[in-house]
């Protein structure tokens, strides 16, 4: 009887531990973080706007909503670890879920937010900032693995190429 109770307790402990391990390693999706994004970081879109965009993309529909300024905003890309929203003609936001080097084994993630400003392809400017998954801004860019660094640099390069194309068109 005593042995049965010990086996039962041990088995219960193992099951609870396995369940907690699975929960800790559950994949965080950028759509979940976008849904939880504080209004103060993107005041032109309400929480309902963000939810609608995610739902529209999941349904294969055009993810366009009327924003708080009376204009149109559209989510143009959504994957498990990245999304892009054309907030207005002058602002596009790209969110990337990246892994800092010191968190590779733990699986902790950081949000990279790239705001690209400009209406003319030849005059685009990007500002990059980093946030914890609780949306607390980080003071500096964390050291990232090569793959994530290349993803961010590719977006920066895209801005430079658009700038170059705009200059060439004008001549």
What is each stretch, according to the model?
Residues 121-130:
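Structural motif
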Residues 134-142:
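Short loop/turn segments immediately following beta-strands, especially the blade-tip
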Residues 141-171:
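Short aromatic loop motif centered on NTY/YTY
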Residues 1-30:
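Bacterial Sec-dependent N-terminal signal peptides
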Residues 96-106, 165-171:
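Structural signature of eukaryotic scaffold interfaces centered on beta-propeller domains
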């Amino acid at each position: 009887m005593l042995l049965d109770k010990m086996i039962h307790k041990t088995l219960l402990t193992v099951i609870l531990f396995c369940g907690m391990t699975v929960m800790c390693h559950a994949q965080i999706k950028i759509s979940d973080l976008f849904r939880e994004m504080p209004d103060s970081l993107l005041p032109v879109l309400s929480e309902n706007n963000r939810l609608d965009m995610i739902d529209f993309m999941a349904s294969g529909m055009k993810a366009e909503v009327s924003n708080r300024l009376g204009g149109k905003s559209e989510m143009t890309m959504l994957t498990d670890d990245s999304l892009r929203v054309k907030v207005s003609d002058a602002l596009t936001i790209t969110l990337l879920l990246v892994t800092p080097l010191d968190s590779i084994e733990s699986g902790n993630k950081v949000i990279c937010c790239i705001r690209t400003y400009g209406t003319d392809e030849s005059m685009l400017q990007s500002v990059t900032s980093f946030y914890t998954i609780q949306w607390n801004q980080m003071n500096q860019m964390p050291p990232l693995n090569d793959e994530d660094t290349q993803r961010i640099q590719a977006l920066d390069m895209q801005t430079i190429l658009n700038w170059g194309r705009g200059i060439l068109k004008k001549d």
